Amino acid sequence: MKWVTFISLLFLFSSAYSRGVFRRDAHKSEVAHRFKDLGEEKFKALVLIAFAQYLQQCPFEDHVKLVNEVTEFAKTCVADESAENCDKSLHTLFGDKLCTVATLRETYGEMADCCAKQEPERNECFLQHKDDNPNLPRLVRPEVDVMCTAFHDNEETFLKKYLYEIARRHPYFYAPELLFFAVRYKAAFTECCQAADKAACLLPKLDELRDEGKASSAKQRLKCASLQKFGERAFKAWAVARLSQRFPKAEFAEVSKLVTDLTKVHTECCHGDLLECADDRADLAKYICENQDSISSKLKECCEKPLLEKSHCLAEVENDEMPADLPSLAADFVESKDVCKNYAEAKDVFLGMFLYEYARRHPDYSVVLLLRLAKTYETTLEKCCAAADPHECYAKVFDEFKPLVEEPQNLIKQNCELFEQLGEYKFQNELLVRYTKKVPQVSTPTLVEVSRNLGKVGSKCCKHPEPKRMPCAEDYLSVVLNQLCVLHEKTPVSERVTKCCTESLVNRRPCFSALEVDETYVPKEFNADTFTFHADICTLSEKERQIKKQTALVELVKHKPKATKEQLKTVMEDFAAFVEKCCKADDKETCFAEEGKKLVAASQAALGL
């Protein structure tokens, strides 16, 4: 890359990076501005989500009251932007409103201390008290007729309750995307409550929304963790890699512009600024659709949809075809004598260009692998550009990439072969044993949940052809391991987990993969109550029964970390036979009591406990 070319690109990048797509003049009243931009319906929905994500224990009715008060105030400001308090920031207005809740100290304890702080510290304080695992009752789905009656009696309240229940259980759910889920939720009830067989129509749709919602929440949680724990630079690097894969025909300056604005949108949502986030996301979708000719050939269908569907579609759109005539990367990033000069002039721009060029050529790599390669390249330049002969030093840098690429390729190949051999449930059990031995201090429910989710990588990704396996698998595993990191951060019990979670975002998965059995772990005392079961297990769904069995498996490994595969297999087969036998018995409870004692004794003998 000639020096003059780099300078012109640097100018383009810098202006795009600092400016972005959004052009916002200062407004006298921010709340009036957002109300006018979003409209009353979206404004109220977003304020409800915001309050439910902060005050996760408050009753629905209390939140509705707060939302109505904020909405009436916003209307006052729309009528007269110079009215009293209309010039206050949204953080100030929302924070003041949160602090009026009479039961704040009683319900949330030390979170009430946030109210003594000034902005922006007050909002930061509220954010730190968001609970990823709130103590809320499990959502139980009512009968279909009951739901349809509630939907017809008061559609608005029914949909608000959906937003409220999801938002308070998922305090980082991407708010504009939750509005999209609510649109689909409403459509499902509108269609199915009129169907001949309401349940057959509705239940599969609700199951699909639930599963997609959990996945969407987990993906957004990783984005927020990236911003909160590793900073804006880490998020921008992720966005450069992902958008370059998705839009390989777009120019670097265009990708940079999109990255700047995508970062702004996610920073706002992760920071609780949901009105700004939704408004800016709509502007970004508008910009992408107005400039699709210079971005991607795959956007036309998305851009014809209504706003919420459009934004969702753009976020999920398939990768565009790679340009046919891309030159070798080596010329600009290895062979050129100007590498160190270009790097010294603008390190992040040069690394951003490297990441852009590498990612657009490799849709078959995971984003985290691309970021590992960029980090290796950066480390090499830091070392070599200070050496006596820089070019000689960095000439073989691409050779260092080979083991980094082969490690996830081999791991995915081995695990997909294992998955195809075992099936999902037994593959999950394999991971349960593996991870319990690595980090036995982690709570049993967390180990079960994380290992079950890790095990789903098989059915999610192994069916894909080779070029799509790695981006599917490794980026999915990053999302699941972030769930472990988030849950562990609240109540840390393992230095190994803390180390893998905090040292490097992109190396989390390799760090966990490399962990061996924890030899320092002192096995738990055997407790027969852990393995005592009752007749209620017979009425559980297949999924709930699996979780019961997997919970027992984790406990067995915690009692006997050095148990062999064969020993564990024998015990689990005996357990399955025991459950099957007693669930068929006439007197189930007696069977579970008598046969259960025998099972515990046999398990202890088999494991040498």
UniProtKB/Swiss-Prot annotation:
Any Pfam family matching the protein: Serum_albumin
Positions of modified residues (N6-succinyllysine): K229, K460, K543, K588
Positions of the propeptide removed during maturation: 19-24
CC per GO annotation: blood microparticle; endoplasmic reticulum; extracellular exosome; Golgi apparatus; protein-containing complex
Residues that bear Phosphothreonine: T107, T444, T446, T570
Binding of Ca(2+) 1, residues: E30, E268, D273, E276
Posttranslational mods: Phosphorylated by FAM20C in the extracellular medium.
Residues bearing PTM Phosphoserine: S29, S82, S89, S297, S443, S513
Keyword Transferase belongs to the record: no
Record's keyword terms, sorted: Calcium, Cleavage on pair of basic residues, Copper, Disulfide bond, Lipid-binding, Metal-binding, Methylation, Phosphoprotein, Repeat, Secreted, Signal, Zinc
Family: Belongs to the ALB/AFP/VDB family.
Record's protein name: Albumin
UniProt source species: Pongo abelii (Sumatran orangutan)
Gene transcribed to yield this protein: ALB
